[in-house]
Each structure stands twice: as structure tokens, then as C-alpha cells.
């Protein structure tokens, strides 16, 4: 009887082992199929294949490479006073709030971009505002870090794998755009009003991402000298750049004239591409609401995905003053009358030169026209509500 029980137990163990091995093989096959699907969708990486676990590892440590380089620089500094300044940047032992953590990482990336670290074995350019201009040779962690903090100007895309660390909406928009062009060089231009930290968190960035084609890469050879990052009033700097970014976005929307393909309108971000024959009423209404929201920040416009709060009171003051200096720039806020005698110094609105070719192929499918529910100024005033965060 005991021998029979032993035999039964052995058979059960064998069956359990076989089931376990079968499950492992099934899981392996599923992973291979998923990897094959991604390769078919996004293409193979030209140099090194990134597996799923490696991508997750890269994504989880986006800022680590930048932070490590700053820590190495700190160890090499012999001057005690200068070392103290760098320790103030890192602040390893002090617990930080979400807003403070954002500012620390933002400062590190600014330092990193400004130094053009010689050990990086990569090719990239910087604009006069120290924003990154990246291509296929640029380190991808640096590209996604610069993008996350509103410091990426242009990404020249020669292969889909360059977007592997970006979110799905950007990747899908790129694939749709690539399907209607045979161009070898596609650019992704970002018009961004960087995120703004305050005492309770971070106000998300506002941005337009525009895809287009070009025959050559623009390279910014001259980078203006800036005030040392260690001496910079970072809150004031971010307020000025966010306000300036809002004006840049507003100007770009006006230049589009509604002739675009719109891929996404979510969470304060538009993803689009130029099209000189696109006349979709729904898209024009969305762009109209975006333009109104940027011109009248305290208004409420349902087709605009910018969420409140839109900025802090300090940024509102900067935006109000800068708007007065722009020709044909509409702006209305509750500070307009109070800001008459306030002078705020900030760079003029930058002019960006872009070389692109518009896609003339029609997008398949019929256009769906929605009723235009635009409001006049009287109705807008009735909808006014606060979008300003008061800093403590």
C-alpha cells in the first residue's frame, strides 16, 4: 500500500513539473510574439536591440545618468566654497517635496546641458535658450529627460526606435504621419511652456508637438552665455520661461490657421502635423478654444485640454506684462489694469526658423463637422473663474 502511494505521489510530482515547464514555454512564446509585434510596429533598432526589461530599467532611471555625472563633478572639486555650492544643488540628505524635487532635477539637467559633458560620446546641438536639438546619435535618456522638463526643442527622427521611451500617443502619431510620407528625415518640433512647481506640487507643462519633414538638420552653433545656474533664482526663471512658452504656443496656433492633422488633444498637449488642405471644422474649433484659453487664461473652453490651475500668480504677472509688448497678441486677465506701471524684464519672444515640407496627401475618411459653439466676449466674462495658484 505504501509503495502504491509513493508511486502515485511521484506521478503527481512529475505531472506538476510538466505543467510548470509547459507554462514557462507558453510565457516565453507569448513574450516572443509580443516582441515580434512591437518590431513590426516600430521597426528594429539600428544598433542595439532593447528588450522589454531593459526599456523598463531605462525608463525608471531617466535622471540617474545626469545625477551621477554631477556627483562625479562634485568629488573632483577641490575648492571648498565651490563644493558647498554644488552640495546645495544635490541636497542629498534633505527630504524634498514634489515641487522641490522637480526643481532640483530641472536644475541638474540645465547644468548638464550647459556643460556639454565631454564624456558623453554623442552629437547634439543646443539652441540659444539652452534647449536640446537631438538626432539619432543623441543619448535617448538625455532626450526623454529634456522632453519631460520642457527642454527639448527638436528631435530629428530617422528610425522609430528613437521614440521607444516616449508615451504611446506620440509613437502612434509618428506612425500615422510616417504612413503618408516617403521622406527619410522627419522632425518632431516641441513648443513648450515648462511645468511650474509650487508649494503643493507641480503644474503640468503645456505644449504643442508638431511632426514635419525636412531635408537637413538645423544646428545652433552659437549658445549665449547665461547666468551661472548656482546663482539663478529658479522660481523666477521658470515663471518667465513658462510665460514666454505660452506666448510662443499662442503664436504657433495663430500661424497654423487650422490647416493641420490633429492626432491628440489630451492633458494640455496637442500633437499635430501641417496640412495645407485640411479643413476639418472640429479641428478648427479645438484650435480656436486653445487660442482663447491662452489669450484669456481665466476663461473656460470645453475643447481645450489645458487643466486648471494654469499657473501661479507670479507667472500671471509676467505673462500679462509680456503680452503688452507683443504686436497683435490678444490678452485679457484680471491683472491687466493693475499691471500698467509694473515693469518686468525678460527676453523678447524668440523667432524660430524651421525648414519643412507640408504633406499634401489627403487623409482617408470623411470629415465630421461639429457645430461651432464659440462664445462672444460677454459670455466669456460670465464663465470667468480663477486659474491662478496663490503661493505661500
Swiss-Prot record:
Assigned GO CC terms: host cell cytoplasm
Residue numbers spanned by region Disordered: 358-392
Record key words, sorted: Coiled coil, Host cytoplasm, Translation regulation
Main localisation: host cell
GO BP annotations listed: regulation of translation
Coiled coil, from the record: 1-88
Superkingdom of the source species: Viruses
Location within or outside the cell: Host cytoplasm
Misc. comment: The inclusion bodies are the site of viral DNA synthesis, virion assembly and accumulation in the infected cell.
Function: Enhances the translation of downstream ORFs on polycistronic mRNAs derived from cassava vein mosaic virus.
Family the UniProt entry places it in: Belongs to the caulimoviridae viroplasmin family.
Protein name: Putative transactivator/viroplasmin protein
Organism whose genome encodes this protein: Cassava vein mosaic virus (CsVMV)
Amino acid at each position: 500500500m505504501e509503495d502504491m502511494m509513493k508511486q502515485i505521489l511521484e506521478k503527481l510530482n512529475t505531472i506538476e513539473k510538466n505543467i510548470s515547464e509547459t507554462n514557462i514555454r507558453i510565457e516565453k512564446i507569448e513574450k516572443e510574439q509580443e516582441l515580434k509585434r512591437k518590431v513590426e510596429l516600430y521597426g528594429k533598432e539600428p544598433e542595439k536591440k532593447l528588450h522589454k526589461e531593459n526599456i523598463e530599467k531605462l525608463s525608471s532611471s531617466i535622471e540617474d545618468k545626469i545625477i551621477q555625472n554631477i556627483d562625479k563633478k562634485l568629488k573632483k572639486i577641490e575648492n571648498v566654497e565651490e563644493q558647498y555650492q554644488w552640495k546645495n544643488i544635490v541636497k542629498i540628505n534633505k527630504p524634498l517635496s514634489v515641487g522641490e524635487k522637480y526643481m532640483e532635477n530641472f536644475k541638474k539637467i540645465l547644468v548638464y546641458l550647459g556643460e556639454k559633458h565631454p564624456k558623453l560620446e554623442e552629437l547634439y546641438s543646443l539652441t540659444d535658450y539652452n534647449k536640446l536639438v537631438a538626432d539619432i546619435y543623441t543619448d535617448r535618456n538625455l532626450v526623454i529627460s529634456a522632453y519631460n522638463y520642457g527642454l527639448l526643442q527638436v528631435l530629428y527622427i530617422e528610425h522609430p526606435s528613437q521614440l521607444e521611451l516616449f508615451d504611446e500617443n506620440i509613437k502612434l502619431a509618428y506612425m500615422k504621419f510616417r504612413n503618408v510620407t516617403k521622406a527619410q528625415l522627419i522632425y518632431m518640433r516641441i513648443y513648450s511652456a515648462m511645468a511650474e512647481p509650487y508649494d503643493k506640487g507641480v503644474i503640468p507643462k503645456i505644449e504643442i508637438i508638431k511632426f514635419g519633414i525636412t531635408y537637413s538638420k538645423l544646428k545652433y552653433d552659437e549658445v549665449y552665455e547665461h547666468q551661472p545656474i548656482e546663482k539663478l533664482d529658479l522660481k523666477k526663471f521658470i515663471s518667465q520661461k513658462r510665460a514666454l512658452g505660452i506666448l510662443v504656443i499662442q503664436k504657433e496656433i495663430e500661424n497654423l490657421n487650422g490647416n493641420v492633422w490633429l492626432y491628440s488633444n489630451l492633458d494640455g498637449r496637442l500633437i499635430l502635423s501641417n496640412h495645407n488642405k485640411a479643413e476639418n471644422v472640429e479641428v478648427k474649433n479645438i484650435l480656436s478654444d486653445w487660442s482663447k484659453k491662452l489669450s484669456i487664461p481665466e476663461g473656460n473652453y470645453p475643447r481645450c485640454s489645458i487643466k486648471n490651475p494654469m499657473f501661479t500668480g507670479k507667472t500671471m504677472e509676467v505673462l500679462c506684462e509680456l503680452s503688452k509688448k507683443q504686436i497683435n497678441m490678444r490678452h485679457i486677465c484680471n491683472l491687466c489694469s493693475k499691471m500698467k506701471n509694473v515693469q518686468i524684464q525678460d527676453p523678447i519672444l524668440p523667432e524660430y526658423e524651421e525648414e519643412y515640407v507640408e504633406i499634401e496627401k489627403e487623409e482617408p475618411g470623411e470629415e465630421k463637422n461639429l457645430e461651432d459653439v464659440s462664445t462672444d466676449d460677454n459670455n466669456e466674462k460670465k464663465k470667468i473663474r480663477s486659474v491662478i495658484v496663490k503661493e505661500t
